[in-house]
Amino acid sequence: MIGKLKGVVDSFGEDFVILDVSGVGYIVHCSARTLQRMPKVGEPAELSIETHVREDMIRLYGFRSDAEREWFRLLQTVQGVGARVALGVLSVLEPEALASAIATGDKGSISRAPGVGPRLAARLAAELKDKAPAFAPVDPALVALAGAVEEGAAPQPVADAVSALVNLGYPQVQAAAAIAAALKGAGEGAEAKVLIRLGLRELAR
């Protein structure tokens, strides 16, 4: 089995990169997020690899981090999730955001992935909540804040700040995480506009 490939970027396809390793071109399928962050053609690159072997083919899946690869494996333990859907989830949520979405039950963020409807998103959140890998710890403050926002129990400035970031196009889980971080710096009594400004700064990092 292949665990890692290190070579030079040869070319890109719609959902794959061809990595030239000592003159051999390997077709490696990746999430859209990973492809966007790959070096340019002709530049060196390294990917962690998951190898899938079937009777009629061998397919390689590539990841920029071991965390992304582990989530790819974990997602496929849920019924109805294959390699394509798992890559779709990782295309819209990086590992840290996915861990937060699972921990907080944020089905809306998960269902943004292609091929993931509300039912499958709910199943993913429910079945993986207790299986989330130890390498993806979630801030307890984020879980508490997300729950308060969901139940309508969050202070109004906090709820308004999260809503504002969501309206700007950020997934609920990322908006909540940014505002949770903003609260730590600004304090519990901060106004919504202050939280929004600090939250946007967090998201820009």
Swiss-Prot record:
Disulfide bonds: none
Subcellular locations according to the entry: Cytoplasm
UniProt entry keywords in alphabetical sequence: Cytoplasm, DNA damage, DNA recombination, DNA repair, DNA-binding
GO CC aspect terms: cytoplasm; Holliday junction helicase complex; Holliday junction resolvase complex
Region spans: Flexible linker: 144-152
Region (Domain III): 153-205
Keyword DNA repair (UniProt): yes
Gene3D superfamilies from the UniProt entry: 5' to 3' exonuclease, C-terminal subdomain, DNA helicase RuvA subunit, C-terminal domain, Nucleic acid-binding proteins
A biological-process GO annotation: DNA recombination
Pfam families named in the record: HHH_5 (PF14520), RuvA_C (PF07499), RuvA_N (PF01330)
Region of interest (Domain I), residue spans: 1-64
InterPro entries given in the database record: DNA_helicase_Holl-junc_RuvA_I, NA-bd_OB-fold, RuvA, RuvA_2-like, RuvA_C, RuvA_C_sf
GO molecular function, one term: four-way junction helicase activity
Region (Domain II): 65-143
Similarity-based family: Belongs to the RuvA family.
Domain notes from UniProt: Has three domains with a flexible linker between the domains II and III and assumes an 'L' shape. Domain III is highly mobile and contacts RuvB.
Known role: The RuvA-RuvB-RuvC complex processes Holliday junction (HJ) DNA during genetic recombination and DNA repair, while the RuvA-RuvB complex plays an important role in the rescue of blocked DNA replication forks via replication fork reversal (RFR). RuvA specifically binds to HJ cruciform DNA, conferring on it an open structure. The RuvB hexamer acts as an ATP-dependent pump, pulling dsDNA into and through the RuvAB complex. HJ branch migration allows RuvC to scan DNA until it finds its consensus sequence, where it cleaves and resolves the cruciform DNA.
Description of how the protein assembles with itself and partners: Homotetramer. Forms an RuvA(8)-RuvB(12)-Holliday junction (HJ) complex. HJ DNA is sandwiched between 2 RuvA tetramers; dsDNA enters through RuvA and exits via RuvB. An RuvB hexamer assembles on each DNA strand where it exits the tetramer. Each RuvB hexamer is contacted by two RuvA subunits (via domain III) on 2 adjacent RuvB subunits; this complex drives branch migration. In the full resolvosome a probable DNA-RuvA(4)-RuvB(12)-RuvC(2) complex forms which resolves the HJ.
Designated name of the protein: Holliday junction branch migration complex subunit RuvA
Originating species: Methylobacterium radiotolerans (strain ATCC 27329 / DSM 1819 / JCM 2831 / NBRC 15690 / NCIMB 10815 / 0-1)
Gene of this entry: ruvA
